[in-house]
Design a protein with these regions (language model features):
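Shared catalytic-loop signature of beta/alpha-barrel
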Residues: 41, 47-50, 58-191
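Extended hydrophobic packing segments that form well-structured cores
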Residues: 190, 194-198
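Catalytic cores of large soluble enzymes that bind and process phosphate-bearing ligands
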Residues: 2-5, 55, 106, 131, ...
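Metal-dependent enolase-superfamily TIM-barrel catalytic cores that perform enediolate-based chemistry
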Residues: 1-69
Length: 198
């Protein structure tokens, strides 16, 4: 029933948005390897861009086995911290899209090293960016200076921040309330600010 329900949901989404929208499916490390492969087979007709974190990313060998059996590309990496770990992940051909998070992988320097390792393996980055407008601006500068970017995550700046739990205040802050400038988003693209800094 689980696989059937998941497939039906994705079928409805694909029907609603059509073929001109890329579906990036976050599985949040919830499946065992065999189930991840089974789900991938069922979702192939809906042509998702990738399956993100179908299994826990702590076993790079197993992620490589899953990736080898799935025709849908795998994206992973938001919980990986060092460029050494990304190198091990990519040596096992465990993903097609690298989900490095600037906030945990060593900032700009670490992310540029990871991008270079990914490029050497013919892989693209899809930077992880769920938390704050400051991180959105940092990611925007990073992607503007990096060749092998597929797409990037862009949280809604007018919705409550996913990082509001970190303040301990209980106040729901919108991202646009935290900074003076929100990059312009138009037709699926963000404008890179001309002014210095993030």
């Amino acid at each position: 029933a689980l696989l059937y329900k998941a497939e039906r949901r994705i079928a409805k989404v694909r029907e609603a948005v059509g073929e001109d929208i890329d579906l990036c499916l976050e599985l949040h490390r919830r499946l065992e390897p065999g189930l991840a492969v089974q789900l991938s087979v069922r979702l192939e007709p809906y042509n998702p861009m990738f399956l993100e974190d179908p299994i826990r990313p702590d076993n790079f060998d197993e992620m490589g086995h899953v990736a080898a059996q799935c025709r849908i590309p795998i994206a992973t990496g938001e919980r990986i911290n060092t460029y050494h770990e990304f190198e091990m992940l990519l040596e096992r051909n465990a993903c097609s899209y690298v989900r490095a998070s600037l906030g945990v992988c060593g900032g700009f320097t670490g992310a540029k090293k990871i991008a270079a390792i990914a490029e050497a393996h013919h892989k693209s980055l899809v930077p992880h960016n769920p938390c704050s407008p400051v991180m959105t601006n940092a990611v925007l500068q990073f992607v503007a200076a990096t060749d092998n970017i597929a797409i990037t995550e862009y949280p809604n700046p007018f919705a409550a921040s996913t990082a509001d739990h970190l303040t301990g205040s209980g106040v729901k802050l919108r991202q646009c309330d935290m900074v003076d400038h929100i990059p312009e988003f138009k037709d699926g693209y963000l404008s890179v600010p001309e002014e210095p800094g993030i």
